[in-house]
Amino acid sequence: MSLLEFFRPQKKTSASLAKERLQIIVAERRSQNDPAPSYLPQLKEDILKVISKYVDIDPNMVDLTFEHKDDDISVLELNVKLPDDEK
């Protein structure tokens, strides 16, 4: 390796540039689309049915959210406000 090659930046191949650009486009489209899966409303109803077997609960007191943290990580968060008294 000569001294000039050390200070000169390495040129990226057109294939690697195309791959990087495609990854950026795919990531943008994933974030723009509806990130929530289609089964979430049914999942929320099923969870409500199970909880209501044990506790009287208002369906408006259940909050189900879904979000993508990274390409590999998705978070499903369920918040249920339970009443003070049990069934």
Curated annotation (Swiss-Prot):
UniProt entry tagged with the keyword Cell cycle: yes
InterPro entries: MinE (IPR005527), MinE_sf (IPR036707)
Residues spanning the signal sequence: none
Keyword Zinc: no
Key words of the record: Cell cycle, Cell division
Top-level taxon of origin: Bacteria
Coiled coil stretches, renumbered: none
UniProt xrefs under Pfam families: MinE
Biological processes per GO annotation: cell division; regulation of division septum assembly
Free-text function comment from the UniProt entry: Prevents the cell division inhibition by proteins MinC and MinD at internal division sites while permitting inhibition at polar sites. This ensures cell division at the proper site by restricting the formation of a division septum at the midpoint of the long axis of the cell.
Family from the record: Belongs to the MinE family.
Protein name in UniProt: Cell division topological specificity factor
